[in-house]
Amino acid sequence: MKTIAVLTSGGDAPGMNAAIRAVVRTAIEKGINVKGIQRGYSGLINGEIFDMNRHSVSDIIQRGGTILRTARCPEFLKEEVRQKAANVLRVFGIDGLVVIGGNGSFMGAQKLSKLGVKTVGLPGTIDNDLPYTDYTIGFDTTLNTVLDAINKLRDTSTSHERVSIIEVMGRDCGDIALFSGIAGGAESVIIPEIGYDFNELCKNILEGKLRGKMHNLIILAEGVGGAAELAKKVEEVTGIETRSTILGHIQRGGSPSAFDRMLASRMGVKAVEVLMEGKTSRVIGIKEGKIMDQDIDEALAVPRSFNKELYDIANMLSK
């Protein structure tokens, strides 16, 4: 293993820079050359590749986003495009590729490995929607961003004695809503894994009002969606002023938390070690606090499980 490359793909996540830093500095320490690929698979296809050194990753561990930029690349679904990408890697003398991203990025790495490219994936996605690992890079920071918004919205909701519906990211996985709902003391959490009863929701709001609650916070995952429409319906039925807030892309930005910096650093080191061991088509994850690697085919085949215990806790503590 003489030269490896690293890229970030798909949606950005806080902690990606910490992972890049760990990959670059670990590889250099082990005598391996490192190249950076800009703009994900799109940049790989176009040969946007440059040499990296220790200085390339100075003062980036605290920065959100990704210094390598990122992009979505739908054309990577085509066999001829992936073949071109594999050829580009060979032309640049790259022996191994570290891919930092989510499900779609891992599928790209999986396809490249079938073409003889040694690949290792790091889970970089705020949604925490890769079931083979307990946590993904960026999830914890996003929770803290959402929690900050919840705290501020509670202040104004209490002042006006209103209902606040906060829509957070999470198209297929409701972990952001579920975890932030518990940590933020929300009265209701609505996630795609479990449907909700609108009448029951309104009943809970009214019962809370009778018990003297000064506000009511509802955390809604974008996979369920329709925060503005839901707010309108809630106000019509309950007669209580209701406002909706969509947090949007603010959830992707910001300096990564200590947890995400540690997680990304540990995973970055492990990725280089896995490549040096001659393994390929692997992904890095964390299980019960331990950094591990797993075959990418097996990882992508792990069914998504729903944490019913946490959901029950959210409901119990909200009353």
Swiss-Prot record:
Its EC number is 2.7.1.11. The active site is at D127 (proton acceptor). Substrate binds at T125, I126, D127, R162, M169, G170, R171, E222, R243, H249, I250, Q251, R252. Its cofactor is Mg(2+). GO terms for cellular component: 6-phosphofructokinase complex. Mg(2+) binds at N103. GO terms for biological process: canonical glycolysis; fructose 1,6-bisphosphate metabolic process; fructose 6-phosphate metabolic process. Its main location: cytoplasm. Keywords: Allosteric enzyme, ATP-binding, Cytoplasm, Glycolysis, Kinase, Magnesium, Metal-binding, Nucleotide-binding, Transferase. It comes from the Bacteria. Pathway: Carbohydrate degradation; glycolysis; D-glyceraldehyde 3-phosphate and glycerone phosphate from D-glucose: step 3/4. ADP binds at R21, A22, V23, V24, R25, R154, G185, A186, E187, R211, K213, M214, H215. It is found in: Cytoplasm. Catalyzes the phosphorylation of D-fructose 6-phosphate to fructose 1,6-bisphosphate by ATP, the first committing step of glycolysis. HAMAP family: Phosphofructokinase_I_B1 (MF_00339). PANTHER family: ATP-DEPENDENT 6-PHOSPHOFRUCTOKINASE (PTHR13697:SF4), PHOSPHOFRUCTOKINASE (PTHR13697). This is ATP-dependent 6-phosphofructokinase. It comes from Clostridium acetobutylicum (strain ATCC 824 / DSM 792 / JCM 1419 / IAM 19013 / LMG 5710 / NBRC 13948 / NRRL B-527 / VKM B-1787 / 2291 / W). The gene is pfkA.
